[in-house]
Amino acid sequence: MADDQSLSARIEALEMRLTYQDETIETLNQAVTAQWQQIDALTRQIAALSDRLAQAETSVAAPANERPPHY
C-alpha cells in the first residue's frame, strides 16, 4: 500500500514536471520565432540600405580636378 502511494506520488510529480517543461518549451519556441522574424526583418533592411548605398555611390561622380568652392 505504501509502495502504491509512493509510486502514485512519483508519477504525479513527473506529470507536474512534464507540464512545466511543456509550458517552458512553448514559451521558448515563441521567443525563438519572434527572434527569427526580427532577424529576417533586419536582414531585409540591411539589404535595402546596402542597395541604396551602392546606388548613391554610383550616381555621384568623382570630381575631375575641380577646384574647391572657396577658390
Curated annotation (Swiss-Prot):
Organism superkingdom: Bacteria
Record-linked InterPro entries: SlyX (IPR007236)
Pfam family, one: SlyX
PANTHER family: PROTEIN SLYX
Similarity comment text for this entry: Belongs to the SlyX family.
HAMAP family in alphabetical order: SlyX
Protein name: Protein SlyX homolog
Organism per entry: Rhodopseudomonas palustris (strain HaA2)
